[in-house]
Amino acid sequence: MKLKILWVGKTQEEWLRRGIDEYTGRIRRYTPLEIAEAREEKGAAAEAMRTRECERLEKLVPKNARLVLLDERGDQLTSPELAAFMGKCRDSAVPEMVFAIGGAYGFADSFRARADRVLALSRLTFTHQMVRVILLEQIYRAHTILNGEPYHHS
């Protein structure tokens, strides 16, 4: 199963880019992975920014992909539960899973309605830039769990 990670805007901080590079390399040992950035909208009201950014994200989602949004109001899973969810998708021949991280103001309701699942990484709020590294680490962790490797300690 191919993975695609979408986010809005460029990663600003070098330390975050290093983390992204580290986990991207680790994940690619298990599965094909593509990362795509949608242009960040600036200088508009929050709702207009959400709408325009989500229109850009929508164009990057393949029609046959399973779309998972990362949002603070989503379902919270443990790492083993995320691994099980990803394994179930893989085993049911889902060709591609897309994880999307919104911009600073989140997702438009129309894009949220398109999602197959909405997940929250925590009840805490993280910057949308930090979520990139956290999500990639959790995807890597899920692969190690699915492969019975010793990275995750229960």
UniProtKB/Swiss-Prot annotation:
One Pfam family this sequence matches: SPOUT_MTase
Alphabetical GO CC annotations of the entry are: cytoplasm
Q: Where in the cell is it found?
A: Cytoplasm
Q: Which UniProt keywords apply?
A: Cytoplasm, Methyltransferase, rRNA processing, S-adenosyl-L-methionine, Transferase
Q: Which InterPro entries match?
A: Alpha/beta_knot_MTases, RlmH-like, tRNA_m1G_MTases_N
Subunit notes for this chain?
A: Homodimer.
Q: Which family does it belong to?
A: Belongs to the RNA methyltransferase RlmH family.
Question: What does the protein in this record do?
Answer: Specifically methylates the pseudouridine at position 1915 (m3Psi1915) in 23S rRNA.
Q: What's the protein called, per UniProt? A: Ribosomal RNA large subunit methyltransferase H
What is the scientific name of the source organism? Geobacter metallireducens (strain ATCC 53774 / DSM 7210 / GS-15)
